[in-house]
From Swiss-Prot:
It comes from Drosophila melanogaster. Interacts with dsh; PET and LIM domains interact with dsh DEP domain, in wing cells. Interacts with Vang in photoreceptor cells. One of its GO terms (molecular function) is zinc ion binding. This is Protein prickle. It is found in: Cell membrane. GO terms for biological process: anterior/posterior axis specification; axonal transport; establishment of imaginal disc-derived wing hair orientation; establishment of ommatidial planar polarity; establishment of planar polarity; establishment of protein localization; establishment of tissue polarity; establishment or maintenance of cell polarity. Belongs to the prickle / espinas / testin family.
């Protein structure tokens, strides 16, 4: 009885041994009743009861509003003490009974308004009538529920009136409870927790020894209160207090700070037993008639508590926590349990400092009662775990400890708040552990050696939280149970040792002393103000120590209120302490046998391995068992007694040995000298199902992928087909049957469009997939199988060679797939005698083969060879062009041209034999692009690589450039690139890929170009070829100026792609325009401006009319990789650019057999040439800039800039003179427009032309038969574009830099 409440316990003891015993018996009965009442599902929502009973944290961790419990406890304690003073012998029972009834009534009223009241009253009334039947009613009927303060008062009064009679019954009930308690004591955890007490289980604790008759209870209460007017007064006071709080309570979702509650002036100490009147008969002589609680007491107990806890706290019964607390019995043996219950009750009441956090956690976790406070966890849980060897005598204590874990899903609430609330009780209400608990046989003996004063509120480190005013009596209920080697939190301490009777173990909520004991250092409140900042703090620390502790933990894991650390803690509680590892009710589809096994499994684990870290400040340095580093003196260390008395860790090192995550709330399990979180410890003992996450208790299970499943859980994640013994596929840790996997995740073949089955071979590359068959995984052009061969991916398609990627029929070199660039054939070979005649042989471009680009040395070698060939070709072209050229202006290459391109300004040059420039006609420009690779038959518009604009300003190495070019130019299925093809075919867009992309309206000259393109490509090609093949030779002096080696270098130096692909403008045009196609197939035997064209049309550039500008390393990226047609004048002049590009393409086509339009960028050095380049004709004439000016060794950084209109011009030059003339006119128009144009597209961050000059010097261009047949690299074009505005401004050196 004494254990029920300090007052009650004291009363029972004072009553005399017999009286004590008698009181104990009724107390036990009443305690049982109380527990039942509190836990009764009718009183509380079933879910709440279940939660309360089964939560891991139920006992030790404060589930609900601790404040409720505190209020109840305090008010009851005060009332009981007063009553005890009046009735000593019976006071114990009365107090106990009252406490139980009051708690039940208050909680029930709060939780279930009318229904709860009826139930509680009925139960209580039955018990009082029966005498023995009077089961304890709510221990603390505080007006904790201000909303129902009147109801509570009525019920309490009724209860008081009927109280005396039911004392005997209460005793009986208590005895019954003791039996239950004994069972609980056997296990470390509370019975509800260990055995997963549901509403039914609640009955186990509550119903045992308790029979409620609502009417009886009500009548008894009424009688009791009639007799106990003092109690009525107290209730009235409480009611008054309640009324104001009622208004307050609903407002805060979270309990107000308990500090507010403290201010209540201590009441004159009433008999300690007053609260415990319910506990049993009132054998104790009424020491003092029930004294009405003083306003201060009431305020302290109710208002402060109410404010802290809020209405929730007022509704203890709603909280499962409240229910769980009712398990404590009043007997001295139960006294520790009672203390535990009180602690729980307190814990249920949110700590004033951490109420918000607690509530937030509870709210976050649906299973947890709103008022559950994670902050309270620390208190209850650690002690229970304290000693591995000692089994917690009371199940409640064990459950409290493990409850936190069991409640992992449920946020454990620290018992600390309970202690704190106890401390808040007025001193007289705060019962000394000794006073509240007469050293009854149950209380002291069961409790075992009293805990050190540090655990008692009075002894708490923080005096303001401690009940220092009260002499710290031996904390029997706080004493660690044998199971707890370390001092358990007050809640745990409240649990009696194993020796205590089971009844005492589940004593009703304890009076103040017990509460105080629980609240002492373990309460979060003990941490002081610091507690308000955190949702949980280690128990027993001062605020400064709390901060020191958290300072050693990562900020993102510090459980500040409403912080990521708080969320982390909640997640970890659920993860590390899975409820289904300990509670049957959280499991699914367990057989009865498995249920039993789970309970045993959970109980054994908790008894043998569960512990809670103890945080202390070191007095001397010691090594950390986690990191082996030294923990300095004065630092905070965490001790785990189960792993040894001296085992200590840094706070940040106190982590699970498996998941390495901080052990939440310091709860750990140990096995073989290692610490585990609850989850991983369970997995060391039993396999865990990967599907349901539950421990596999069955004899059979399925193991796959190194994991385990229940036999019926290893099934297809989609169709639930069991996969035991079946084929399956794991994806993201989930098994799928083959059918579902194919339906959900199968890839589709890019060739045939069919799904690639699990059983089928699959080839994948860069997000593309093919059946691993010769048919599907084959060259997109020639359809030769690529299985086991290197392949060239371009524009979403795969090719066996560069030629195929350009849409040309594969040549032995191209289709060989050797990946080595064949030695470029002499330009003459590549030049076809007849435009229609197929190109005899292309100089294989570095791109020709599907193999990777050559190394720089190889490139250089090829470049040298190609330069020679190109030089020859260009010479021939120049010679042929020379005849055609009416005028040849050699423009001093501007520095910026850097020897890239020197354009012959005159359109006449273009008009010359080189008018064959395909840009002169759409076909002509196309023809250049087509060049040998792009023979009309071979040409596939969809394979035309889209002009790629290199955005990099830095020098490109050829391999990289080639890869980039390939990517940009990779041929793509016609369907994919149909639009592009159309754009390319569009004379405007063809000449200027950028423009094509932009669909820029071509200037008049562009229109002319389009018209030219409209002209049959064959005509233009023929003319061009004729011109190209027979262009008037340019002045001999000019030929040398056009160093073909540079072109060859460009082709060689260029990445194979650059070399292989024509400048995209040229390439696009040539491919796009039928002419170019034809010309490609019928590349003119004469190399059209071999230099520029060679680079562009060299076999290396033999790629389909790709307009790739090559930038050399030495050249700063003055010319942006971006295609800027305006800079070339072609870009700005749209059509002009296109024409230039066509010219370039033609040049490339002529030089390269028109197949290769990969253009090395030749930077025009002469501003005039650049200006001319800007003008379509100028570009054409100047596009012949010698590529050889580029050092072969220097990697050409290719920037795809607008198709060099110069090349187009050159191509036009190759065309018939009439066409050349038209080309010249167009070019002039372009020039005019370009001159007016601003370098809009040359987004080059490149340096001025001087930079180019410094890096490269282009020999003066020669007029090729009056036709400027020269390939203008994109750089040159871009540079020209840049320079053009400057030229327009009269500043030849001015670079139009767009960055």
């Amino acid at each position: 009885m004494s254990s029920l409440s300090t007052g009650g316990g004291a009363g029972g003891s004072s009553g005399g041994p017999g009286g004590a015993d008698a009181a104990a018996a009724p107390a036990a009965g009443q305690a049982t009743v109380t527990a039942t009442g509190n836990m009764e599902p009718a009183m509380v929502p079933r879910t709440a009861n279940l939660l309360a009973c089964k939560q891991w944290w139920r006992v030790c961790f404060l589930y609900g509003d601790q404040q409720k419990y505190y209020r109840q406890l305090y008010s009851k304690a005060a009332a009981q003490r007063l009553a005890d003073a009046n009735q000593e012998p019976d006071n114990a029972r009365d107090r106990e009974y009252d406490t139980v009834d009051c708690d039940l009534i208050a909680g029930q009223l709060d939780a279930v308004e009318d229904a709860d009241d009826g139930i509680d009253l009925g139960d209580h009334s039955s018990t009082p009538k029966g005498g023995a039947t009077t089961a304890g009613r709510p221990l603390f009927p505080h007006s904790s529920s201000p909303r129902r303060s009147k109801k509570l008062l009525r019920s309490l009064r009724a209860h008081v009136r009927g109280e005396k009679l039911p004392k005997n019954d209460t005793t009986t009930a208590n005895e019954s409870s003791e039996v239950t308690q004994r069972n609980a004591r056997v296990t470390v955890l509370d019975d509800p927790f260990l055995f997963g007490i549901d509403a039914d289980h609640l009955g186990d604790l509550v119903v045992r020894g308790k029979r409620y008759s609502t009417l009886d209870a009500t009548e008894n209460m009424a009688r009791f209160y009639a007799e106990q007017e003092a109690t009525a007064q107290v209730l009235e006071i409480i009611e008054q207090e309640e009324e104001s709080p009622e208004q307050e309570a609903p407002k805060p979702a979270l309990p107000p700070k308990q500090k507010q509650q403290r201010p209540v002036p201590p009441l004159p100490p009433p008999p300690a037993n007053r609260v415990t009147q319910d506990q049993g008969t009132q054998p104790a002589a009424p020491q003092v008639p029930l004294q009405p609680l003083t306003a201060g007491d009431l305020q302290f107990l109710n208002l402060s508590l109410r404010q802290r806890s809020l209405p929730r706290s007022m509704k203890p019964f709603k909280d499962a926590h409240d229910i769980s607390f009712t398990f404590n019995e009043l007997d001295t043996s139960a006294e520790p349990e009672v203390a535990t219950g009180a602690a729980q009750q307190e814990s249920n009441e949110p700590i004033s400092r951490t109420p918000l956090t607690q509530i937030s956690y509870l709210q976050k976790i649906p299973t947890l009662p709103r008022h559950f406070s994670p902050s309270g966890q620390g208190l209850a849980t650690p002690p229970a775990l304290g000693s591995g060897g000692m089994g917690l005598p009371s199940s409640s204590s064990a459950s409290a400890l493990y409850a936190a874990q069991a409640a992992a899903g449920i946020l454990p609430t620290s018992p600390l708040p309970l202690q704190r609330h106890q401390q808040y009780l007025p001193p007289h209400h705060q019962q000394h552990p000794g006073a509240g608990m007469g050293p009854g046989p149950g209380s002291g003996a069961a409790a075992g050696p009293p805990l050190g004063p540090q655990y008692s509120p009075g002894c708490s480190a923080n005096p303001k939280y401690s009940n220092a005013q009260l002499p710290p009596p031996p904390h029997h209920h706080h004493q660690l149970s044998p199971a707890l080697s370390t001092p358990s939190p007050p809640s745990l301490l409240h649990h009696p040792a194993g020796g205590t009777s089971s009844a005492s173990a589940h004593a009703p909520f304890l009076g103040g002393p017990h509460m105080d004991m629980q609240r002492q250092s373990h309460s979060d409140d003990d941490s002081g103000c610091a507690l308000e900042e955190y949702t949980w703090v280690p128990p027993g620390l001062r605020p400064d120590q709390v901060r020191l502790y958290f300072s050693q933990i990562p900020d993102d894991k510090v459980p500040y209120v409403n912080s990521p650390g708080e969320q982390y803690r909640v997640r970890q509680l659920l993860h590390q302490l899975p409820p289904h590892d300990n509670e049957v009710r959280y499991c699914h589809s367990l057989t009865d046998e498995e249920r039993k096994e789970l309970r045993l499994f959970s109980t054994q684990r908790k008894r043998d391995a569960l512990g809670r870290g103890n945080v202390r400040q070191l007095m001397s340095a010691r090594p950390c068992d986690g990191c082996d580093d030294l923990i300095s003196t004065g630092d905070i260390a965490v001790f785990a007694t189960r792993l040894g008395p001296n085992a200590s860790w840094h706070p940040a090192c106190f982590a699970c040995s498996v998941c390495r995550e901080l052990l939440v709330d310091l709860i750990y399990f140990h096995r073989d000298g290692r610490m585990y979180c609850g989850r991983h410890h369970a997995e060391t003992l039993k396999p865990r199902c990967s599907a349901c996450d539950e421990i596999i208790l069955a004899d059979e299970c399925t193991e796959a992928e190194g994991r385990a499943w229940h036999m019926n859980h290893f099934a297809c994640h989609e169709c639930d087909k069991q996969l035991g013994g079946q084929r399956y596929i794991m994806r993201e840790g989930k098994p799928y049957c083959l059918h579902c996997f194919d339906a959900m995740f199968a890839e589709y073949c890019d060739y045939c469009g069919e799904a690639i089955g699990v059983d089928q071979g699959q080839m994948s590359h860069d997000g593309q997939h093919w059946h691993a068959t010769d048919e599907c995984f084959s060259c997109n052009t020639c359809r030769c199988s690529l299985l086991g061969r290197a392949f060239l991916p371009r524009r979403g398609a795969i090719y066996c060679s560069i030629a195929c990627s350009k849409g040309e029929p594969p040549t032995p070199s191209d289709s060989s797939g050797t990946g080595m660039y064949t030695t470029p054939t002499p330009p003459t070979q590549r030049v076809r005698p007849h435009p229609q005649a197929p190109l005899p042989a292309r100089i294989p471009s570095s791109h020709a083969s599907s193999s990777p680009p050559m190394s720089p040395q190889q490139q250089q070698q090829h470049q040298a060879t190609f330069n020679q060939a190109m030089y020859q070709m260009q010479s021939q072209q120049m010679e042929a062009a020379g005849g055609l050229v009416d005028q040849s202006k050699s423009y001093a290459a501007s520095d910026s041209d850097a020897g890239v391109v020197k354009d012959l300004e005159h359109g006449g040059h273009m008009g010359g034999g080189d008018l064959t420039d395909f840009s002169g006609g759409r076909a002509s420009s196309t023809s250049q692009n087509l060049s040998p690779l792009n023979s009309p038959g071979d040409f596939q518009p969809h394979f035309l690589p889209k002009p790629m604009e290199l955005q990099r300003d830095g020098v490109y190495n050829f391999n990289e450039m080639s890869s980039n070019l390939d990517a940009a130019w990779s041929a793509k299925p016609t369907n994919s690139y149909h639009l592009q093809r159309q754009l390319l075919e569009n004379p405007h867009t063809a000449s200027m890929p950028e423009l094509a992309g932009k669909l820029v309206a071509p200037p008049a000259h562009m229109q002319h170009l389009s018209q030219l393109h409209a002209v049959s490509s064959h005509q233009f090609q023929q003319h061009e070829y004729a011109d190209i093949l027979h262009p008037p030779p340019p002045p001999p002096g000019e030929i040398p100026e056009l160093p073909t080696p540079n072109l060859s270098v460009a082709s060689t130096a260029l990445p194979p792609e650059l070399m292989g692909s024509p400048t995209h403008s040229a390439g696009d045009r040539s491919l796009n325009t039928p002419m170019s196609t034809q010309s490609a197939s019928h590349a003119p035997p004469h190399p059209v401006s071999i230099l520029s064209g060679a680079s562009s049309s060299s076999p290396m550039s033999g790629e389909p009319a790709k307009k790739k500008g090559v930038r050399f390393e030495g050249i700063p990226d003055t010319l942006p990789r971006s295609r800027s047609y305006s800079g070339n004048g072609a870009g700005t002049s749209g059509g002009g650019e296109r024409e230039r590009d066509r010219d370039k393409d033609k040049e490339g086509g002529g030089r390269h057999g028109h197949g290769h339009s990969s253009r090395r960028r030749r930077r025009r050095k002469s501003s005039s040439s650049s200006s001319h380049h800007r003008s379509g004709s100028g570009h054409r004439s100047h596009s012949t800039t010698r590529a050889d000016t580029y050092a072969p060794a220097q990697p050409l950084s290719s920037s795809y800039q607008g198709p060099p209109s110069v090349l187009q011009a050159a191509n036009l030059v190759h065309e018939s003179p009439s066409r050349q003339q038209r080309e010249r006119e167009r070019e002039r128009e372009r020039e005019e427009s370009e001159e007016s144009d601003v370098c809009s597209t040359c987004s080059s961050s490149s340096s001025s032309s001087e930079d180019y000059m410094m890096m490269y010097q282009l020999p003066q261009r020669r007029h090729y038969g009056g036709v400027r047949v020269s390939y203008v690299p994109n750089d040159a074009l871009a540079y020209d574009r840049k320079r053009k505005p400057s030229e327009l401004g009269g500043d030849k050196d001015k670079n139009c830099i767009i960055s």
